[in-house]
Structures are given as structure tokens and as C-alpha cells.
Swiss-Prot record:
Catalytic activity: (R)-pantothenate + ATP = (R)-4'-phosphopantothenate + ADP + H(+)
SUPFAM superfamilies: Actin-like ATPase domain (SSF53067)
Cofactors demanded by this protein: NH4(+); K(+)
Protein name, entry field: Type III pantothenate kinase
Annotated function: Catalyzes the phosphorylation of pantothenate (Pan), the first step in CoA biosynthesis.
Coiled coil: none
Positions with a binding annotation for K(+): D132
Organism annotation: Borreliella burgdorferi (strain ATCC 35210 / DSM 4680 / CIP 102532 / B31) (Borrelia burgdorferi)
GO molecular function: ATP binding; metal ion binding; pantothenate kinase activity
A Pfam short name: Pan_kinase
Gene name for this UniProt entry: coaX
Length: 262
């Protein structure tokens, strides 16, 4: 029996997890993850592909913030699909509907870059604040008219939680969850409250400040593997899109100017 055709495989290699998205008819048909391991071997990745990807693809686009794994994935993909994957980056040339850089290009993680591109290309917004809550918490602003405005990078909730456990002798590990109240009466409840309300106030504070700074309306888009823990706390209208990064990687891969690719 022939394998079903899914034309594009998008891979987002992050610090905590590696996301795989298969696109069919411009929709995410399959979305799965594996844990990031800096020691991942060729045979481990190949076995993962055998178990999960009984599909044909004709394009593979990758965003990676863990370059030590790039060669392994490149080799596995070529062996498995007979395709050379394209690694997207902020410093390549793309044919987009807007110019991300109105001045000199500056160093930007490929995942952040993909988020910002998707926020403009996939939505009819003029100005967007994009929050990605994963290993790190990134909050970046982008404008259709002025390009990427900049942003802030903070540690994500799990890093903050583990740092507290490592440095506070009397606080023992417990499951983290969205707090019921701002002010809690137990240690675990208070830690949960502090852990997640800080992101609520960070996101809402940055959102209000940039609106005042630029005197413009900004739409808010939230993504990231840990975002679900804070969504119920946010009191500003927002869009949640768990696929924002892979959508951006796909847009970039399909709009690249191959004259500038080695």
C-alpha cells in the first residue's frame, strides 16, 4: 500500500523538546514531540522516524537553536526521505509580504524569527506582540510597517522552578499547576502563584508599555509548550496558537530566495 503524501515536514529543534509537524493542504496534519537530548544518536532519531513517519514528503524545513544536533538530523532526513533539509535562519533572504528588518539585521533565534514572521504573514494584524513560553519566555514585538521592533528574553517557568528547588533547602519538589488564587497559604501554593503570576504581570506589563511607547494598537499572540499554564490568568485579549513556530518555519522555507543559499 502506498504511503499517504504529506508534502512538508517542519521540525523545530528546541532546548527542551523537538517538535515535528506534517502539513497537508496548508493544515497541520500531525504534530508530535520528542525530548531534546544533546547526545541523540543517528540510530535513535532514525528509529523515531520509522515509528512515527509512515509518510512521503518532498520538503523538510528545520529551525534549530541546538546546532550540535543539526548534522544528525540532516543525515537522518537524507537517509529516510532522500531529501536535503533546509535550515532556516534570520540571516537568509526571504520573499515575504513585509520587511522584517528595516535596518541592519541583528542576531535572532530562528524560532523567535519564525514566530514573528507567522504573526504578520498569517494574520491581518499591523502590530503584534508575540509571547513564546517554553524553556525561555520570549516577548517580541513586530510591525508590518516597521519590521521587528525588538523584545525581551527571560527564563521559562520550569527553569525558574528548578532553580528555586536547587537553592531553597526547605522547598521540596511538587507538581506545578496553575494557582487558584494570587495569595496562597501553603508553601507549594505560594510557589505556584509566584511562578505563574510573574508571567501574567510580565506579559500584561510589556503589552501595556509598548502600546504606550508606540502609540499604536498591538495584538497579542501566545505560543509555547508551557503557555497553557498561564493562559487562564491573562486578562488581555489574545490568540493562542501552539503551531505558530512551525507555521513560521514553513512560511520561511517556502519563501526563501535560493540564490542566497549555499
Amino acid at each position: 500500500m502506498n504511503k499517504p503524501l504529506l508534502s512538508e515536514l517542519i521540525i523545530d529543534i528546541g532546548n527542551t523538546s523537538i517538535a515535528f509537524a506534517l502539513f497537508k493542504d496548508n493544515q497541520v496534519n500531525l504534530f508530535i514531540k520528542m525530548k531534546t537530548n544533546l547526545m541523540l544518536r543517528y540510530d535513535e532519531v532514525y528509529s523515531f522516524f520509522e515509528e512515527n513517519f509512515d509518510f512521503n514528503v518532498n520538503k523538510v524545513f528545520i529551525s534549530s537553536v541546538v546546532p550540535i544536533l543539526n548534522e544528525t538530523f540532516k543525515n537522518v532526513i537524507f537517509s529516510f526521505f532522500k531529501i536535503k533539509p533546509l535550515f532556516i535562519g534570520f540571516d537568509l533572504n526571504y520573499d515575504l509580504t513585509f520587511n522584517p528588518y528595516k535596518s541592519d539585521k541583528f542576531l535572532l533565534g530562528s524560532d523567535v524569527f519564525a514566530n514573528l514572521v507567522a504573526a504578520i504573514e498569517n494574520y491581518s494584524f499591523e502590530n503584534v506582540l508575540v509571547v513564546d513560553l517554553g524553556t525561555a519566555c520570549t516577548i517580541f514585538a513586530v510591525s508590518r510597517q516597521d519590521g521587528i521592533l525588538g523584545g525581551i528574553i527571560n527564563s521559562g517557568p520550569l527553569i525558574n522552578f528548578n532553580s528555586l528547588l536547587d537553592n531553597a533547602y526547605l522547598i521540596k519538589k511538587f507538581p506545578i499547576s496553575t494557582p487558584n488564587n494570587l495569595l496562597e497559604r501553603t508553601t507549594s501554593g505560594s510557589v505556584n502563584s509566584g511562578l505563574f503570576y510573574q508571567y501574567k504581570y510580565l506579559i500584561e506589563g510589556v503589552y501595556r508599555d509598548i502600546k504606550q511607547m508606540y502609540k499604536k494598537k498591538f495584538n497579542l499572540i501566545i505560543t509555547g509548550g508551557n503557555a497553557d499554564l498561564i493562559l487562564s490568568l491573562i486578562e488581555i485579549e489574545f490568540i493562542f496558537n501552539i503551531h505558530l513556530t512551525v507555521e513560521g518555519v514553513r512560511i520561511l522555507g517556502n519563501s526563501i530566495d535560493f540564490k542566497f543559499v549555499n
